[in-house]
Amino acid sequence: MIVVKEDFFKSDICNLIARGTEVYQWQYDHKADAANPRHNKFFISLLWTETTPKNFFYMLWRIIRKDIPLVGDCYCWRIIANGQVKGQNGDWHTDHGDKTVLYYPREWLPEWGGSTYFKTDDAETEVEYKQNRLVAFTSNISHYGSCPTVYNILRVSIAFSLRINKSGERNVAD
């Protein structure tokens, strides 16, 4: 299942998230499948994990969980930002965990490309990159993020990695 929500956060929060992407601490060493030498590297910034104090990004997760029924039964174990420039197409992959939420924080023109593609059964679905769009899906759906088609633009997506809350495992209201 894939759920797409437009204009998800209020404009002030959307703008704050977008401005924040300018100061992320990027590393250039991530792959969709680290064991696959043919997969392209791209940029990653670790925004929050279960072992770090709750922060702004965790607060965003709490808003998402409250407003997106598909992920209401989940807890978040990691939040990262993915960064891609021209030439850094993602590779088809599935995610770790049970469900994933992607958020597109930056202003974006359609001609810049950067769509996310999903493969379900034998069909491909394109979800265009659009600022303040949120995409939630089950992590076993194969997908990839395409790179920008123009130079000097960083495509940023924020990925919330989720697991289904098993009885007694996590407090869903946390």
Role assignments for model-derived ranges:
Residues 1-74, 80:
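Non-heme Fe(II)/2-oxoglutarate
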